[in-house]
Amino acid sequence: MLNAGRGNPNWTAATPRRAFFTLGQFAVDETQRVWCDGDLAGMPFKKGIYDRFKEYCKNNKDAGGIDLLEEVIEYGIREHGFEPDDWVFELVDAIIGDNYPVPDRMLVHIEKIVREYLIKEMGGDPKTDTHDIFAVEGGTAAMCY
């Protein structure tokens, strides 16, 4: 979602960028739900996170990009059969960004979506098993330029 908001030298795509920041707000709320001591917070908790996300969306209908963010979550569940808690947790844990240098390659769910997108854009059949996507830091920037 972050790169979807990347424009060129003189523009940005506002809705994906807002969705990215709204996901970040939800993620920080999740860390503080687990443990909060002043400016310190805990780590997101997976069990029930999808339901908490849906509740967050219901209570924050005016948050920037919330409709897109909800659709991204539902797309993964609907089109890829992702288990809802696993999918939302992966995104939340990723945006918190405290697992460096893990993972050593793309996140499990994200890799499936990126793979499908790249194969489709290159004119292939995303349903084939002939492609292995191994993107690392800087890989998306290389694709942009």
Predicted segments with their positions:
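Conserved N-terminal helix/loop that builds the PLP phosphate-binding region
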Residues: 1-71
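Conserved core of the PLP fold type I
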Residues: 40-145
